[in-house]
Amino acid sequence: MNYQPTSEDRFTFGLWTVGWQGLDPFGDATREALDPAESVRRLSQLGAYGVTFHDDELIPFGSSDNERGVAHGAGVAHQAVPAGAGRDRHEGADGDDEPVHAPGCSRDGAFTANDRDVRGTRCARAIRNIDLAVEHVARASTCAWGGREGAESGAAKDVRDALDRMKEAFDLLGEYVTEQGYDLKFAIEPKPNEPRGDILLPTVGHALAFIERLERPELYGVNPEVGHEQMAGLNFPHGIAQALWAGKLFHIDLNGQSGIKYDQDLRFGAGDLRAAFWLVDLLERAGYAGPRHFDFKPPRTENFDAVWPSAAGCMRNYLILKDRAAAFRADPQVQEALAAARLDELARPTAEDGLAALLADRSAYDTFDVDAAAARGMAFEHLDQLAMDHLLGAR
């Protein structure tokens, strides 16, 4: 099989992924800084469709209006990758990455900071960056990750008030986008913890519930990340299925994670391989049309010689899993096993003829054979082993 990616695969990378220098709380950088234009060029050569970037990654925090207007970095990124691939991640709008985005003042977050003046300046800054995204990036969307929106102490934050302020901030952004006539939507990225002890909107479910309380919920969706949901011990494909069901999967971050621990950002497929298989199967069967975006970090043990193969491995692993999932679905024995597991019945409404018909149907309760139903096996194990055979290349 040919697992060479093309632009039709819509694979994208954050500039901060291949550009990560290996700096962590316990050690200095192990790689030199990369020029963003070089990152874009190399990713394009590998077959990537586009790039994403943090709001201050190409135009530094504190730049003058004139400097922002030039937007040199955004122009380079847009020109060097196939057209229409850009996406501006306004993670700094939430004050997520303090050393890069806002020294000191966002130590308690941005939209939910206890300091009212900090909230005001961060909202204003987010609006300025929206203007930049719309002006310089084709088909822009903005991701909001509230990495510092949270607390370590129960007394430090009234979460109800904090959610009010979070709602207020997103409503202001939605109002501005609507007034300006911008074709732009917001994708909220959940994460349970790190860098804060506990972060607000920690999971896909929390974010989906929050969105329904906003004044313009149609402008907002989610940007789930594999590792973030798995840090909370959750089933990532299930979360994605619910986001798709709600029509709110605006973007997705693919990487690898091995269990409940710190955010590992492994290359895609290098963590929970079974979850990765079911995720690819779901995205492809659902016809998800958005980019397959990789938010990973080449390990700090590696030099630059391994950075680009690591990025290529993300795409290759996705394509291998896509091939394996397609073979699984096309297998006649799998079709038989799916029927034996009665997946077709799950797709049918329980009360197909409505409430009155259900209540009038004696077989639904009065004459229902409990013993016969209890004796039925579900045949899930055979179906799952067939999936394992395909995943492991044994079929």
Curated annotation (Swiss-Prot):
Mg(2+) 2 binds at residues 225, 228, 263, 265. Residues 80-108 are annotated as: Disordered. Its main location: cytoplasm. Its cofactor is Mg(2+). It is an enzyme of class 5 (isomerase). It is found in: Cytoplasm. The active site is at 54, 57. Belongs to the xylose isomerase family. Homotetramer. This is Xylose isomerase. It comes from Streptomyces lividans. The gene is xylA.
